[in-house]
Amino acid sequence: MMIDNNCGKEKVWVPNPEKGWINGDLIKEIPGEGWLVRDENGKEIKIEKDELRMQNPVIQEGIDDMTSLSHLHEAAVIHNLIKRYEINSIYTYTGSILIAINPYTKLPIYSKEMIESFCDQPVSKLAPHVYSIAESAYREMLNFQKNQSILVSGESGAGKTETTKFLLQYFAAMGEKGNGVNTSLISEEDIVEGNNIETQVIKSTPILEAFGNSKTLRNDNSSRFGKFIEIHFDKIKGTIVGAKLETYLLEKSRIVKPPENERGYHIFYQLIKGFNNSCCLKNSSNNNKDEDSSSSSNNNIDDLKSLLKCKASDFNYLISSGCDSIDGVDDSQVFIKTENALKVMGLSNDELIGIYKILLSILHIGNIEFEKGKEEDSSIIKYGNSSFGESFSDDDAGGYNPLEISCKLLGCSVDSLKSTFCSRKMKAGNESYTINHTVEQASQARDSLSMFLYSRLFDWLVVRINQSIDKIGTEKKDNSFLFIGILDIYGFESFESNSYEQFTINYANEKLQNQFNHQIFKLEQLEYEKEKIDWSYIEFSDNQECIDLIEKKPLGILSILDEESQFPKSTPSTLCTKLYNNHSKSKNFEKPRFSQTHFIIDHYAGKVEYDTNLFLEKNKDFIISEQVSALESSNWKFLTNLFQILSKKMNGGGGTSGGGGAGGNKASSSAAGKSTFKFTSVSSQFKESLNSLMTTINSTNPHYIRCIKPNTEKRANLFDNVMVLHQLRCSGVIEQLRISRSGYPSRLVYDNFIKRYKLIVAKDFKNDDDSNESKEWNSILKETDLNSSNGGTNNQIELKRKGAELMINKLSIDISSVQFGLTKLFFKSGIIANLELLRSQTMINSATFIQKIWRGYTDRKAYTSTKHSSIYFQSLIRSYLQQLEYNSMVEENSAIHLQSLIRTNELEKQFNQLLSTTIHFQSLLRRLEDSKEFNTLMDRIKKIVKIQSLWRSNLAKKQLKLLKAEAKSLTNVVAEKNKLASKLGDIQSKLDMESQLAQKIKNENEQLSSQFSNIQIEKEKLQKDFGNINLEKEELLLKYSALESEYHQYKQQNELIISKLKQHINDLEEKQHQHSYKNNEVVGNTSFEGSTTTNNGVTSPPKSSPASPIRNSINSNSDTTISGSSDDSIDNTDSLILSPKQHKGEDRKRNHEISSISPPRSRETIGHDDDDNNVDVIPRRQFNELEKEYKELKQMDETHKQYIESLKLQITQLEEKVKKSSSHPRSLLPGIPSNINDSPKVVYTKSSITNDNSSSHHQQQQQQHNISPSNSITSTTSPINMMDSNIKSLSYKDFTNSQEIDAQQQLHQYHLNNGTNPATSTTNGSGNPLSQSSPTGSDKHIQQSTISDLVSALNFNNCQLESGKYLVDLIIKNHDSIVSKYVPSEMGGIPEPAFILSRCFLKNIYDVDATVIGTPNSTNSGGGSGTGVLDPIETNVNILIYFCDKVEEVIYRDPKSNCSALCYWFSNFYTLFNIMETYNQDTKDQLSLNDQDKALIEKLKITLQTMIVKAHKNVVKNITDYIQPILHKSLNDTTSEIDFMDPITNYLNQIQISLSLENCYINNNLCKLLFEQLFSFINAMIFNEILLRKDLCCLRSSIPIKMNISELEHWVKLHHGKEWSSSVCDKLRLLKEVVYILMIDKTQLQNDELRDEICPTLSIAQLKQLLTMYSPDVDSFEDPIPLEILTSLMDSPKYNPDENILLDLSKIFTLKFINSNQTLSSSTSSENDLMATINLNALESVQYACDDLVSNIVKKNIEIVSLNNQKSIKK
């Protein structure tokens, strides 16, 4: 298959003078002349074959690397840039060059998310960007430990400065990463600029622009110097350690002779117009008010006040060019920015004044004029009638004298400086003589001084900037750091009139281009060598000849120029003549036809014609030693210091490169001894500076950025083709394309080549299926399909290479146009385009063939259908005709049959009529005969009837007679009947009366039964009330008995305590007199050997009679008397009553059922109730007895109520007496407060007494004896134990161990743990899970220290602060063993540190009664020697804040802390905060705090909030540090498919376990929030990667990503409910939309409705970026995204060009607090969702074993007490 490069009608590019290139169609070939082409305007043009420019295939439209274009030429390049610029893709690669087109608008592609996306990514994976070049330079610097350089070039206004800023921004972010900062999770406000070197470099930009930029014909802010910024990095970490700025090639001639219609440097114009607003003037006015202000400073200001009234037209240097302003620029406002930048760099007011004075002196020096002197060839200074300085002439009586003003400003002698202008000294041997200057030479000496001053000032500013940004010093450059240099230099220039400036600029660009060509050749060579292809015959162009033409000695242009500059009588003509004579034969040098002062140089970017009229003047840079001496002898300290600083820098090799930044002059006063007049040409300085720059660049690995200016109007979306094409030529881009085109610019890996173009040769192999070649091809295809990646083993690559060779042979491609590398195919320019045409044509042919087959199939199917329809239609017609014939025959037969029927009918009618007539006649005859016979018979019958009637009448008369005789005998019978009826009525009335009576009796019986039932119910109710009354009465009696018994016991114990206290105090006083140091032993012996005897706290109540316990108890209670009249009998009795507030938790915790005891039934008065329903009428006697018994019960109830009221009254009186007399005995105890409220209290609560029918009297006695359940003690300790808190200076352990109460505690806990009824056993409700015993309530058991003991231990001796901190240290010290340790509770697991701290300290803040108050004999809480009472709130707050600080110091700063540990401490702070919030809510109406206490509590709350945020950040950092590398590795691994699901879900399982409610007390909503944030982070990371990477933005990558997303969603649904799965999975919606878009037809997105339905979350800007980056798969038949779709998206009203298309990772993990009354919340949850529910009662009821902590705290307290006693004894 032979490829014809021009097969078919192809699209070509036609040159156009206005647009550069336009579209054209190739019509036909004209033999011997070329090709005939028709352009887009319809004009036909003949183009030679060599000039033909073919268009590239559609798939390469808007490609991001133009070296991949099949046809490499200017037209293709400019078209590609236009297409990319239309969609705001301003960056494009051309090989290793990055082309950056200035968009003249702000684009959202420079965010920190974009920086994060480019970090650690290869250039080939991401779209072109300035960050990509920066990343490449940064990674190569660290990986190869070699310095890098980035060369940024372009015209003025092309964006070089902005590009430099973006490079510095990226390097700063990399420096932050080197310090371990995750830049993706920190906002821009969080980045600290303390060591932000790049920010300081950027801030120096206004200074350099003011002193080094000027207005030119093509740019209002053209940089007239080059700068090289070195960013210094640490070799290992990659952090920024410093920076350095070097300047090159300052255009000094612009100071004295700006070109026509251009300006000098901006600073002159800014100073004149903006000095009125200078900060120096404001500061001077303030200094005048200060008596100590120096007079010299005021004199300096006075010298500058002349600036207030001058203008640019007053100075020769500023007005000579005819331009002194810029349209749209206010120089006065720019001056303020410049001055602020100088202040930022650290310049003082005196230094600012010094700068202004030098600038003003330069302007006045420029106003010095000369005239001829009296002697020949002499000159003198012209005084009076000056052409300049009109604003100054009025002030001076003698007229304006610029020389005098200049000398005054510089502090120099007028005579010494004057002589340097008009004459010079020459030495000949030992003699010296003076030579006068001509007027022209005097002007040159004047200008030389001005340029010298300005260049030195510029160099000094650079030195000062370096002092500000160079943190480590240049002396360590070779050893301690690496650097990346950024070169910002003006690009190639070519105007209608080109002078000396353009010559030097183009010379510099020629050198840079030469270095660039060698670098490109080197890169190409490395690529070819890597792939091992034959490249020896490839020729690369070189511009060395042009460089030799300019700089080669002795006959180079620069050498001839310097030679001519030293001859006084040289002219431009003589200069050009020498050039013509020496270089006329050079191919890079031409002589113009019509000019003798011009010459042409053929540069790499094209030919440039130079005008030499000002070459000689601008090349001269005389340095007169007398001028230097005059300046150095100045009495102005600033000027002399300036020269000294520069001299040190130059002698030390620092500063600008070779001093060439502003001229490189090293002359000083020492030069006066050798030569009084030294000539140094600008060109030689320029050459030296350039060579130094090239040496620096050559020592680095260079990278290139070419900035392009799209139009001169500085408008967005305006592209000037011709202007851009010119810049491409000047920037070397076209040259680079030419170099690439000379080699093999098109490259494809074997796998991609086979996949994309296999369909072209598929037909050839298919035609010969049996050949070995076809079999080999099929095996290659299988291997290619199995290995989708570009890599593989060597055998696989070799197999693919064979496949590529087979394809090349089948395609008949010239073997000289192809090179087979190790992994790639290399093609000459145009081959890929032809392959694309063939592929397109093959696809078209295949589509045509498929259409042909399909159309044949459809037509054949239609024909068959038509044929079948026709046959069927014919059959229908035939059937219809046959049916018609059949119907006709049927009708004929029917007619014949009908006729026969009609005839038959007529004959039948006739026969029937005759028959009926005959029959009728016969009937008439027969009737006549019968009538006669009937009449005869009737006459006979009448006669018979008459005879019979006569006979019957005779018989009736006889019977009547007999009846009349019988009637007379029936009258008597009737009378008897009437009598019987009367008797029957009487009997019936009697029966009715008896029935009514029976009914009445029955009704009365029913009423009595109803009354009996009601009375029975009332009886049962009264019996129940009677039982309750008896129970209450008995409980009151038991309570009174217990109170009385406890009083006597307590009185005995108090007496025992007082005696021991007195004995102990006596011992202490005796030992203090002896100056003994054994107080610790005394305290210890007292603590642990004190009163240990325990009396039963409650006596048994009186035993009741077994016959009738209820009535006996009532009788006994009625006979009981209540004593208590004396004060002794009621002393301290109220100490036995426990306050409800102290045991609020126990009362709420235990709700015992109260079972009533019913009295025995009276069997005498009440019959068998079960038989009542069987009795019809209740006997009256039983009813009366029942009514009587009811009255008795009612009366008994009233009696019991009165008795109970009397008992209550007596108990109340007893309690009042106890309260009145409670203070007397306690005041006798030394060291114990007399306030009885501080003592411990005990209360006995009512509990149930169960009395079943099966219970025995022995059980009742045992219940009463054990006090429980009838008298449950809710206190956890005995009164003696509680009193220990008031005698802290003596001991820690209780004076007595209440064995009775401890046994009850254990027994109650036993029943709680075993699920038995606590009402039938003993309990005290302490809730201690460790104090368990058998139900028998044994007194012997082992007691363990609980949290209550720990609280008491902490309060020991009022050393709470010091012992509390010691407790915190113990917790933190054992943090490894304490991690994942939780205290079980009914709310869930509570972290142990949070539980201990909340019970020991946090509770004390909100519990005033439990707060420890210092006693007069106690020390302060810290164990120090303070006196007075210390605020307990402050003590507890300080301990908790100390805990926060220790955790942050030990845990959070430990790099070894894993996620589980961090989650554990996160749960601690979260739990503490929620407990504190619950306390705030519960006690806000009860506590009355002063302002100081409120401030302390608020401080603690803020500290906890801060720690929660820090804990959250640490957890997030640990999570992201694990997940982020996994995602990066999965997305970047080319050897396998994307798979990040397994490692992430495994890690999520760990997080879920660490934060689950089963393990720690973390609110479920907080866990949900964390997972939502985590999934948002995954969504944002992958989304940002897809949006910027071509290898991910394709169909092939979208499938595995979708699978991983589905797996993640499945994991969430599997481990959490619907609420979690819906909200958490919703965080991946943006990623799911992107994946879906990658899979569908992209043309659907043009429709607004479909687009909103497909991707409702995705913004238009993000969608446009996604489609811009999308590239079809190599073997896909899909076309690239049409640019029309992208432009339509950009035209949408919803499109926001300033939108940040990437998701901000720093705003995902947010956790904030709403206000003081609300809890944690975030951007994704409501205000109260994150608040955990805390049950304070449940929390306080939990007892936890802490023996070790108690033991350690006790030991610590003993040490503190001992130390304090020693201190007190010493005092």
UniProtKB/Swiss-Prot annotation:
Residues 843-872, 866-895, 940-969 form the IQ domain. Residues 1180-1224 form a coiled coil. Residues 1143-1153 have a biased composition (Basic and acidic residues). Residues 690-712 are annotated as: Actin-binding. Residues 7-57 form the Myosin N-terminal SH3-like domain. Myosin I heavy chain is single-headed. Dimer of a heavy and a light chain. Inability to self-assemble into filaments. It comes from the Eukaryota. The keyword Magnesium does not apply. Residues 1112-1139, 1253-1281 have a biased composition (Low complexity). Pfam families: DIL, IQ, Myosin_head. The keyword Metal-binding does not apply. GO terms for biological process: actin filament organization; endocytosis. Residues 1077-1111 have a biased composition (Polar residues). GO terms for cellular component: actin cytoskeleton; cytoplasm; membrane; myosin complex. ATP binds at residues 154-161. InterPro entries: Dilute_dom, IQ_motif_EF-hand-BS, Kinesin_motor_dom_sf, Myosin_head_motor_dom-like, Myosin_N, P-loop_NTPase. Residues 61-840 form the Myosin motor domain. It comes from Dictyostelium discoideum (Social amoeba). The lineage of its organism: Eukaryota, Amoebozoa, Evosea, Eumycetozoa, Dictyostelia. Belongs to the TRAFAC class myosin-kinesin ATPase superfamily. Myosin family. This is Myosin-H heavy chain.
